[in-house]
C-alpha cells in the first residue's frame, strides 16, 4: 500500500489537453529516495511468495549409472535486498533496479538408483547475485487517474548453490551442477512475471486518489491531469487541473489559468504549487452558489458594543430612519455583487470584494421594510496555512469604502456610517468568514499520507508548499 501510494504520486501524469494547470506538483530526488526505502519492504515480501515448482529428472552418474531424482516442497525462507535504486526515466516514469539480492530456500530430495535403492533427505539452497531491472511506465486512464505497468524487465540469477542433508547426500553432490542450473532457470523465469504482477496490483490502490475531492455542501475540487509530465534527471513536474466546481454542476469560470513555472527548489520531497486561478475559481463557485451572502441581526453584535442594529442607533446618523421607523430592530443583508478577486504577490495575499449591504427595519409583524442599499468595497489581507492535508486561511480587514446605491429614506451622508460598518465587518462578518476558511479544502492526497516539515511561500501569482511526506499505512 505504501509503495503504491508513493508511485501514485509519481503517477499523476496528466492527459494531454491544451490548458494550463491550476496546481503543479514536483516530486524530487529526495522524494524518490523515500519511496525506494518504503518500497523495498513491500518488494521483499513479494519475493518471498515465489513458488518454485518441483523438479525431477534422470541423470547418469559414474560409477552408479542412471539416477532418478526429485526436489519438492521448496520454500523461500529468507530474502535480502542489500542494493536497490529508483531512478527517473525521462518521458516514461521510473526505473527500479535491484542488485546483489539473495534468496535462501529449503526443500526435500528423493533419489532412486540401481533400480531398487531409494533414499531421501533435505537440502538448503543459496541463490546469490540476483538482479532485477524494470521500468515502471506511468500513464493516465480515461478518467485522469494513474495507471502503472512494468516494461522492459530483465532478471538474472548469478549463482545457485545447493547443499544436501541426510541419506545419500553424497550422491546428489555428484550432479549438483545439473540441479543448480534447473533451479536457477526456474527462478529466473518467475522474476519478471512476479514483478509485473506486483506492479499491476498497485492499480486498484491508485484508484483511491482524490481526483475529485468534496470540499463542503457547495463545492468540490478537481485534480485530474491536464498535460504530460516533465521528467528531468532530478525531479518530476506534473500538472493538475486544480479547479473548484459547484457540486453536480461543472461550470467553467469566465477566466482561465495563466502559465507559471516552479522555482528550482529540490530540498523537500514534494512541492505543491497552488495558483491564484485555483483560489479564484473557488470564489466563482461560492458566489455562483449564492453562498457569499449573510443576514446580520442584532444578536450577532457583541453585547458590550455600543452599536446596536436598531433604528435608534442608525437614526443618530440618518434622522429619517428614526422618524419613520421608531423603536424598531434592524437587519442587514451583506451580499457579494460579483466574484471576489484574489491576488498573490510575494509574501502577500489580498482579496478584493464588491458587495451590497441592504438595511431593513423589522416591523412588529416581522415584515422587512427596506431602508437603503449601500455599495461596499472591501480589501482584506489573507494568511494561508497548511492544516493536516488541507489548505486553510484567515483574513483581516485592510480597508473599506461605502457609497450609496439606493435610499428609501431620502438623502444622507454615507460616510457617517463608516464607523458602524467597520464594527459590523470586524466583529461579525470577518469572524464568520474565518470560521469557514479555517476548515480549508483538500490538497491532492494519496492513501494515508501525512505532510511534515511543511513551509508555505507566497510568490507572484501562486503559492508554493514545500514539504516532506510520511505514509502511515
Curated annotation (Swiss-Prot):
Tissue expression: Expressed in spleen. Lower expression in gill, head kidney, entire kidney, skin, intestine and blood and lowest expression in liver and muscle.
A GO MF term: lipid binding
Top-level division of the source organism's lineage: Eukaryota
Predominant place of localization: secreted
Residue positions with a glycan: 365
Region ranges (Central sheet, part 1): 19-29
Disulphide linkage map: 153-192
CDD domains to which the protein is assigned, alphabetical: BPI1
Residue segments, region Central sheet, part 2: 211-275
Cell compartments where the protein resides: Secreted
SMART domains: BPI1, BPI2
Induction: Up-regulated in response to pathogen stress, such as exposure to lipopolysaccharides (LPS) or S.iniae culture.
Classification via Gene3D superfamilies: Bactericidal permeability-increasing protein, domain 1, Bactericidal permeability-increasing protein, domain 2
InterPro entries documented for this protein: Bactericidal_perm-incr_a/b_dom, BPI/LBP, BPI/LBP/Plunc, Lipid-bd_serum_glycop_C, Lipid-bd_serum_glycop_N
Chain segments carrying region N-terminal barrel: 28-209
Gene Ontology BP term (one): defense response to bacterium
Subunit details: Monomer. Homodimer; disulfide-linked.
Family named by the database record: Belongs to the BPI/LBP/Plunc superfamily. BPI/LBP family.
Protein name in UniProt: Bactericidal permeability-increasing protein
Amino acid at each position: 500500500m505504501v509503495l503504491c501510494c508513493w508511485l501514485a504520486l509519481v503517477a499523476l501524469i496528466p492527459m494531454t489537453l491544451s490548458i494550463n494547470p491550476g496546481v503543479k506538483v514536483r516530486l524530487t530526488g529526495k522524494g524518490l529516495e523515500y519511496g525506494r526505502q518504503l518500497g523495498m519492504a513491500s518488494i521483499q515480501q513479494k519475493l518471498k511468495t515465489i513458488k518454485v515448482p518441483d523438479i525431477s529428472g534422470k541423470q547418469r552418474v559414474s560409477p552408479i549409472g542412471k539416477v532418478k531424482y526429485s526436489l519438492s516442497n521448496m520454500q523461500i525462507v529468507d530474502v535480502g535486498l542489500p542494493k536497490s535504486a529508483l531512478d527517473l526515466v525521462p518521458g516514461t516514469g521510473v526505473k527500479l533496479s535491484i542488485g546483489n539480492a539473495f534468496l535462501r530456500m529449503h526443500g526435500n530430495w528423493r533419489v532412486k538408483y540401481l533400480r531398487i535403492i531409494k533414499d531421501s533427505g533435505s537440502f538448503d539452497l543459496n541463490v546469490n547475485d540476483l538482479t532485477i531491472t524494470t521500468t515502471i511506465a506511468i500513464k493516465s486512464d480515461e478518467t485522469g487517474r494513474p495507471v502503472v505497468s512494468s516494461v522492459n524487465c530483465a532478471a538474472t540469477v548469478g549463482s545457485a548453490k545447493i547443499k544436501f542433508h541426510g541419506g545419500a547426500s553424497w550422491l546428489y553432490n555428484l550432479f549438483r551442477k545439473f540441479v543448480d542450473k534447473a533451479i536457477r532457470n526456474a527462478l529466473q523465469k518467475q522474476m519478471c512475471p512476479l514483478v509485473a504482477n506486483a506492479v499491476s496490483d498497485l492499480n486498484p490502490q491508485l484508484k483511491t486518489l482524490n481526483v475529485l475531492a468534496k470540499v463542503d455542501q457547495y463545492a468540490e475540487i478537481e485534480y485530474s491531469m491536464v498535460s504530460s509530465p516533465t521528467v528531468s534527471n532530478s525531479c518530476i513536474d506534473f500538472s493538475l487541473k486544480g479547479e473548484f466546481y459547484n457540486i453536480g454542476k461543472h461550470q467553467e469560470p469566465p477566466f482561465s489559468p495563466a502559465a507559471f513555472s516552479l522555482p528550482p527548489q529540490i530540498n523537500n520531497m514534494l512541492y505543491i504549487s497552488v495558483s491564484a486561478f485555483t483560489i479564484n475559481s473557488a470564489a466563482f463557485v461560492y458566489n455562483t452558489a449564492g453562498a457569499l451572502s449573510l443576514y446580520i441581526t442584532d444578536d450577532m453584535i457583541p453585547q458590550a458594543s455600543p452599536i446596536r442594529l436598531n433604528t435608534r442607533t442608525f437614526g443618530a446618523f440618518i434622522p429619517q430612519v428614526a422618524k419613520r421607523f421608531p423603536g424598531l430592530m434592524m437587519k442587514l443583508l451583506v451580499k457579494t455583487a460579483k466574484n471576489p478577486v484574489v491576488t498573490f504577490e510575494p509574501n502577500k495575499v489580498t482579496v478584493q470584494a464588491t458587495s451590497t449591504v441592504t438595511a431593513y427595519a423589522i416591523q412588529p409583524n416581522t415584515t422587512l421594510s427596506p431602508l437603503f442599499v449601500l455599495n461596499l468595497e472591501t480589501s482584506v489581507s489573507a494568511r494561508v496555512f497548511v492544516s493536516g492535508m488541507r489548505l486553510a486561511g484567515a483574513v483581516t480587514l485592510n480597508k473599506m469604502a461605502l457609497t450609496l446605491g439606493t435610499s428609501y429614506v431620502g438623502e444622507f451622508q454615507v460616510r457617517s456610517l463608516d464607523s458602524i460598518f467597520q464594527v459590523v465587518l470586524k466583529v461579525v462578518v470577518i469572524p464568520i468568514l474565518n470560521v469557514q476558511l479555517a476548515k480549508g479544502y483538500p490538497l491532492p492526497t494519496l492513501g494515508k499520507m501525512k505532510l511534515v516539515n511543511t513551509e508555505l511561500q507566497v510568490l507572484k501569482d501562486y503559492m508554493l508548499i514545500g514539504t516532506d511526506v510520511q505514509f502511515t499505512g
